[in-house]
């Protein structure tokens, strides 16, 4: 009887665990809210921040966790059974961004409700979805007349509908994102439909020079869009005997630790500053530097003074730049490339670090302004940075009037006549309409006709 009572007690507890509480019941999916521009559209499938959002098909049932695949199973825990068959649903998301610049924004004379539109844009050349931004500089209606209204519009679509999230922000004088607003869920777009914020930012705050949102009376709106591209099911079977949880790769962290704690170092690099910064000494590893840089490889391979003494002195690179360069050589990563791009591109060119050099070119392209465009072009020419050079010339051509009023342009005219010639040649090519060659008419065939 005692054993029977214990069995009944255990059975009743098991049944209690199998019952799903009211708080555990799934919520119903909310339908689309079409009533107002500022109301959110809820989505039946919740979206995350990753490029590909996966949703495993194994749900919690009767109080037990089911492992849908080897990646989430625990090999040593007998309480977590492993599903022999599983499915992953991958919601693929395409992310892209767009910047819209409006010059002389304070002169916009549009009345309340009137619209300015950007040119159309898409995620890529083969993307059939066309988007544009539109603003109401003086608000959409009476309620928002003191605000700037901002929307994302689906101009062209080859589907019945598209789900997308978006984020708007304004770039200040330092090209930093400010006043960002984003949708918390994916919106349902159809062709000709827009979603956005009726009260994006107050006009008086935007126009106040002290806030620095209109440098040179130029409004720069940055938009990031995430579009649901497709949903793919991936199915498979689990081989229980091969369940291994592989830890993430820590190679970059381990290599940084090797650089930082000087363990097993066999070479000393002394870096002196021309700007008064303290001299720094780096204890490094010849094998790593030789593998990463052809310059260091040649230095260590031949019987040079540096190779014999296992020490070298560098006085043409600042110590903090040299440290960032060495961190990149050990880990393949760099934290401060945006702040050090001009100095790092010189160091990367000196030590023939081609990938780092292109990374610096990209960072400098993002930092292009009318004030520094000429200097950036001269920098690109000095270090044979072809991509940065082409981008700088194109930027100067697009903003020629503003660039020609800067001191950097005067330096370019005075010291770099060949570069100046290249800029004018590109400008002339851009402005001259293409020449259409007209072929002479073909001769008529001769006929034996008296007329």
UniProtKB/Swiss-Prot annotation:
**Pathway entry:** Protein modification; protein ubiquitination
Q: Which InterPro entries does the annotation name?
A: BACK_BPM_SPOP, BTB/POZ_dom, MATH/TRAF_dom, SKP1/BTB/POZ_sf, TRAF-like
Question: Per its UniProt entry, which superkingdom is the organism in?
Answer: Eukaryota
Q: Where in the cell is it found?
A: Nucleus; Nucleus speckle
Pfam families, alphabetically?
BACK_BPM_SPOP (PF24570), BTB (PF00651), MATH_2 (PF22486)
Which GO CC annotations does the UniProt entry carry?
Answer: cytoplasm; nuclear speck; nucleus
Outcome of substituting residue 197 to V: In dr100; suppresses the age-dependent paralysis and growth arrest induced by exogenous dipeptide repeat protein PR50. Decreases spop-1 protein levels
Q: A GO molecular-function term, please? A: ubiquitin protein ligase binding
Q: What name does this protein carry?
A: Speckle-type POZ protein homolog
């Amino acid at each position: 009887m005692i054993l029977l009572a214990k069995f009944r007690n255990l059975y009743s507890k098991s049944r209690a665990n199998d019952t799903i509480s009211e708080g555990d019941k799934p919520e119903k999916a909310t339908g689309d809210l079409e009533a107002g521009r500022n109301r959110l559209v809820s989505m039946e499938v919740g979206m995350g921040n990753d490029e590909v959002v996966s949703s495993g098909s194994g749900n919690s049932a009767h109080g037990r966790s089911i492992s849908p695949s080897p990646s989430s199973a625990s090999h040593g825990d007998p309480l977590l059974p492993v599903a022999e068959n599983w499915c992953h649903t991958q919601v693929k998301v395409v992310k892209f961004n767009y910047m819209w610049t409006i010059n002389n924004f304070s002169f916009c004379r549009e009345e309340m409700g009137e619209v300015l539109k950007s040119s159309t844009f898409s995620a890529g050349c083969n993307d059939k979805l066309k988007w544009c931004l539109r603003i109401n500089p003086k608000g959409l209606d009476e309620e928002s007349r003191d605000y700037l209204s901002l929307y994302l519009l689906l101009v062209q679509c080859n589907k019945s509908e598209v789900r997308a999230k978006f984020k708007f922000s304004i770039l200040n004088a330092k090209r930093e994102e400010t006043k960002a607003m984003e949708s918390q869920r994916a919106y349902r777009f159809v062709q000709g439909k827009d979603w956005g914020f009726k009260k994006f930012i107050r006009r008086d705050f935007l126009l106040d020079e002290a806030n620095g949102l209109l440098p040179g009376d130029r409004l720069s709106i940055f938009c990031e869009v995430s579009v649901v591209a497709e949903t793919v099911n991936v199915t498979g079977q689990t081989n229980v005997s091969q369940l291994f949880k592989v830890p993430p790769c820590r190679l970059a962290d381990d290599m940084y630790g090797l650089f930082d704690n000087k363990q097993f170092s066999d070479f000393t690099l002394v870096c002196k500053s021309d700007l008064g910064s303290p001299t720094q000494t780096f204890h490094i590893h010849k094998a790593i530097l030789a593998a990463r840089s052809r310059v260091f490889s040649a230095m260590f391979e031949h019987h040079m003074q540096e190779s014999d003494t296992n020490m070298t002195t560098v006085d043409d690179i600042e110590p903090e730049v040299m440290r960032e360069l060495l961190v990149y050589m050990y880990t393949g990563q760099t934290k401060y490339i945006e702040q050090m791009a001009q100095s790092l591109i010189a160091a990367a060119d000196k030590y023939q670090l081609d990938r780092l050099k292109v990374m610096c070119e990209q960072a400098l392209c993002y930092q292009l302004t009318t004030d520094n465009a000429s200097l950036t072009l001269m920098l690109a020419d000095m270090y044979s940075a072809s991509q940065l050079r082409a981008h700088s010339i194109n930027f100067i051509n697009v903003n020629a009037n503003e660039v020609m009023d800067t001191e950097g342009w005067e330096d370019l005219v005075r010291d770099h006549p060949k570069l100046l010639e290249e800029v004018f040649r590109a400008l002339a090519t851009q402005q001259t309409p293409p020449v259409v060659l007209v072929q002479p008419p073909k001769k008529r065939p001769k006929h034996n006709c008296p007329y």
